[in-house]
């Protein structure tokens, strides 16, 4: 076989950061559950299943962990603009969506009931098959994922 001069050039790549929080998840879960019925006004761009998560020291600590981990990986500083609680009841899922106005998004798993759905990410590298490069991750208590706001994602049943 003739030796060829070929070089691999990466044009696009999507990184996902996985970290683990050290906060008291029981205390945070109580705050989230206590605010479950306190829903955002749909007129400001939230969905009906998103609950208000009032400012608290547990979320503040997670935000600092995420900012620290993101900086360690990218040498970029980020600041949160909003956060909320998203509690799935049995057999609930989340439709495919993204957070296109956000540079970075994150999800934190506070509690994982048996039978919880997986989070799936759908990079749009194939114009004919949206799931061609999909990746699926089982939820883990205390784990967070940091990802680009434009990255489509969903939660299975």
Predicted stretch roles:
Residues 79-146, 150, 154-156:
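Catalytic core of non-heme Fe(II) oxygenases with the double-stranded beta-helix
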Residues 1-76, 93:
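Non-heme Fe(II)/2-oxoglutarate
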